[in-house]
Amino acid sequence: MDPYKVIIRPLVTEKAVSLIEKENKLTFIVDRKATKQDIKRAVEEMFNVKVEKVNTLITMKGEKKAYVKLRPEYNASEIAARLGLF
């Protein structure tokens, strides 16, 4: 799957911002058909980082949300700043 079709948009909520600061995690709304491997590959390719873990869930709205934990050597705050979240 094309990485630019996997990730639809970053999610900016109070919880998402606290996860960036405390747990080095980014939150995205992703394509409903995307697997965890697709999401990992897309984030690594788009942002030039290494992903440690991906957790996904389907929201009540029917969207798929992905929590992407980056490896300790990468900083989620820097990626968020590049995306314009801060």
Curated annotation (Swiss-Prot):
Pfam families: Ribosomal_L23 (PF00276). GO terms for biological process: translation. Keywords: Ribonucleoprotein, Ribosomal protein, RNA-binding, rRNA-binding. GO terms for molecular function: rRNA binding; structural constituent of ribosome. InterPro entries: Nucleotide-bd_a/b_plait_sf, Ribosomal_uL23, Ribosomal_uL23-like, Ribosomal_uL23/eL15/eS24_sf. Transmembrane segments: none annotated. The keyword RNA-binding applies. Disulfide bonds: none annotated. Belongs to the universal ribosomal protein uL23 family. Binds to 23S rRNA. One of the proteins that surrounds the polypeptide exit tunnel on the outside of the ribosome. Part of the 50S ribosomal subunit. Contacts protein L29. This is Large ribosomal subunit protein uL23. The gene is rpl23.
